[in-house]
Amino acid sequence: MEHSSWHALIKAQLPEGYFGKINQFMEQVYSQGIIYPPKEKVFQALLTTLLEEVKVVILGQDPYHGPGQAQGLSFSVPDSIPAPPSLQNILKELSDDIGVKKSHDLTAWAEQGVLLLNACLTVPAGQANGHAGQIWEPFTDAVIQVVNHLDRPVVFVLWGAYARKKKALVTNPHHLIIESAHPSPLSVYRGFWGSKPFSKANAFLKETGQEPIDWLR
């Protein structure tokens, strides 16, 4: 992370010494039990999607907490792992909106400028939201603020009540916010189905002179 285009700008948004606190937290929790994603993938979203490449931000809450699922990109799992229910619903909405994506590994989105960011970057095995409120939210809020300050228009995709609270951090009128219910089976019928976030994002990117995302990759 230190050598990425993100580092200095995120650091400037945080209190002095906050990166050190994150390192201490990670050393502690990874030494005490099973934590997801693997330590080397905690910052995968920022390493795969460089700041100068960001076109879309899709905000999740925290990583998947089952074996082999989390890979440091919100909602994504490796193709060797069955797609969790929320991801199944995302891919169904994509199919209805644009077409069928055969892979449920979303790395190809990240490589095209889709920042797949979780608000909390680690989770204990089997404990959803187990690290919520401990260290990560100021860091990931800083990431959102760094993107908000870009002159280049960016699409923020906010699914569910938790992500929609982050709308307060997106104050730049150049950007587009797409919000709906969460793709979880518990809430998908409250406005996620038929929300067409993928075609809406691409329409905005084209309008602002940017290459659209190939969501089917």
Curated annotation (Swiss-Prot):
Gene Ontology process terms (BP): base-excision repair, AP site formation via deaminated base removal
Reactions the enzyme catalyzes: Hydrolyzes single-stranded DNA or mismatched double-stranded DNA and polynucleotides, releasing free uracil
Keyword Hydrolase set for record: yes
UniProt entry keywords in alphabetical sequence: Cytoplasm, DNA damage, DNA repair, Hydrolase
Active site: D62 (proton acceptor)
Primary residence: cytoplasm
Keyword DNA damage: yes
EC numbers: 3.2.2.27
Subcellular location: Cytoplasm
GO CC terms in record: cytoplasm
EC category: hydrolase
PROSITE patterns recorded: U_DNA_GLYCOSYLASE (PS00130)
Short name of one Pfam family: UDG
Transmembrane regions listed in the UniProt entry: none
Highest taxon of the lineage: Bacteria
One Gene Ontology MF term: uracil DNA N-glycosylase activity
Function of the molecule: Excises uracil residues from the DNA which can arise as a result of misincorporation of dUMP residues by DNA polymerase or due to deamination of cytosine.
Family classification: Belongs to the uracil-DNA glycosylase (UDG) superfamily. UNG family.
Protein name stated in the entry: Uracil-DNA glycosylase
Species for this entry: Streptococcus pneumoniae serotype 4 (strain ATCC BAA-334 / TIGR4)
